[in-house]
């Protein structure tokens, strides 16, 4: 789960990490009132969307007068902001963050992520803040340092000092950097975050440090114990199909292809998408109905897939372990009738009650294309959508 910058800064503030004063705004008038309350003399007007690269896309601008704030807020609110993370369609700006301007002397990058290979938390830092870290990694990888933190011991002072020295912070900033780094680590662990990123971490002319941006991702499996974080959720920023799928406990992710996929099990779903691509097709989604699918869930899955106008065919690939093939067959038949299916449908079933499931589909009177192997299923659906 992602949140907005201003929400992330509220979390950082609660953990003692210094951030500029700021006020969210949903209208131009609220933006003006926020600027007046902050007092100036310089403000930063920031678009709030769940994507990076806002500055390059025209979503972050400096204002030196209240009239500037009013004009810029009017320009940004409602715009379709396009960045390298939004795709060509962009994202509509529905809220702003009005923030005090900062005395920028030098910008740094810091982030924490879980490293699955080492089973530790990776603290990534760079002297090159304020720009895409991917670009830094590509052009000057030597300017990025990574420290692995043992979750049993946490981030100690010695390791934090090593990070500060590694990115070239002056001695005058080291003590504050150590304090910020340790608080960031505590924030990361206590909130069950999967990513905490500050880009940039600013050093001003007095060598004081402050987080000028905040990006958070949270482990959705841990949200049940963080009602305060769940309250930050902005459904307007999420894929409507994914939001709808979550209501029915369906694991759904939209993709760019034209073949809808309905599978039970995440691993089989990934293998199904790979097989479709292997035979020249493009999956339109990842969809795992899980081990407890019902006819209702299958019907809702079909409805969600078919709301995508790009979907020209559907592949159902089921391995009946806990999930019985006849249950899926019943769901597929009900779904086809409920949505008045008009695109090709290929179904491949293996496992528990396989013969009964196949018999039900064959006797349904519906134009369902049967397949026995994944390769055959992929070949048939790719051919059917061409």
Swiss-Prot record:
Cofactor: Mg(2+)
Cofactor note (record): Binds 1 Mg(2+) ion per subunit.
Record flagged with keyword Nucleotide-binding: yes
Keywords: ATP-binding, Ligase, Magnesium, Metal-binding, Nucleotide-binding, Tricarboxylic acid cycle
Domain ATP-grasp residue range list: 9-244
EC class: ligase
Residues that coordinate or bind ATP: 46, 53-55, 99, 102, 107
Listed EC numbers: 6.2.1.5
GO molecular function terms noted in the UniProt entry: ATP binding; magnesium ion binding; succinate-CoA ligase (ADP-forming) activity; succinate-CoA ligase (GDP-forming) activity
Protein family membership: Belongs to the succinate/malate CoA ligase beta subunit family.
Protein name: Succinate--CoA ligase [ADP-forming] subunit beta
Native source species: Polaromonas naphthalenivorans (strain CJ2)
């Amino acid at each position: 789960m992602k949140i907005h910058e201003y929400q992330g800064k509220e979390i950082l503030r609660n953990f003692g990490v210094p951030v500029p004063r700021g006020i969210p705004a949903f209208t131009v008038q609220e933006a003006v009132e926020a600027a007046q309350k902050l007092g100036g003399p310089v403000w930063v007007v920031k678009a709030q969307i769940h994507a990076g690269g806002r500055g390059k896309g025209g979503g972050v601008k400096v204002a030196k007068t209240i009239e500037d704030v009013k004009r810029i807020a009017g320009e940004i609110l409602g715009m379709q902001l396009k960045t390298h993370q939004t795709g060509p369609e962009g994202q509509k700006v529905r809220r702003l963050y009005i923030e005090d301007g900062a005395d920028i002397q030098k910008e740094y990058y810091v982030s924490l992520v879980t490293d699955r290979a080492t089973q530790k938390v990776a603290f990534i830092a760079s002297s090159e803040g304020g720009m895409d870290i991917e670009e830094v990694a590509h052009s000057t990888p030597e300017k990025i340092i990574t420290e692995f933190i043992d979750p049993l011991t946490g981030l100690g002072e010695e390791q934090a000092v090593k990070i500060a020295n590694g990115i070239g912070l002056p001695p005058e900033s080291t003590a504050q950097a150590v304090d910020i780094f340790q608080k960031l680590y505590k924030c990361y662990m206590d909130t069950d975050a999967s990513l905490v990123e500050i880009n940039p971490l600013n050093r001003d002319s007095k060598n004081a440090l402050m987080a000028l941006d905040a990006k958070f991702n949270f482990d959705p499996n841990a949200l049940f114990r963080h009602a305060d974080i769940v309250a930050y959720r902005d459904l307007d920023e999420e894929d409507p199909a994914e939001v709808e799928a979550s209501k029915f406990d369906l694991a759904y992710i939209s993709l760019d292809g034209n073949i809808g996929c309905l599978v039970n099990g995440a691993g089989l779903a990934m293998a199904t998408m790979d097989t479709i691509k292997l035979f020249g097709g493009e999956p339109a989604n990842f969809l795992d109905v899980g081990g407890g699918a019902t006819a209702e869930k299958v019907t809702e899955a079909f409805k969600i897939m078919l709301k995508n106008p790009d979907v020209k065919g559907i592949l159902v690939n089921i391995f009946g372990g806990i999930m019985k093939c006849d249950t899926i067959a019943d769901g597929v038949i009900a779904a086809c009738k409920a949505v008045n299916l008009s695109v090709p449908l290929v179904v491949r079933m293996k496992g528990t009650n396989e013969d009964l499931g196949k018999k039900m589909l064959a006797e349904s009177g519906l134009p369902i294309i049967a397949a026995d192997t994944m390769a055959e299923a992929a070949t048939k659906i790719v051919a059917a959508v061409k």
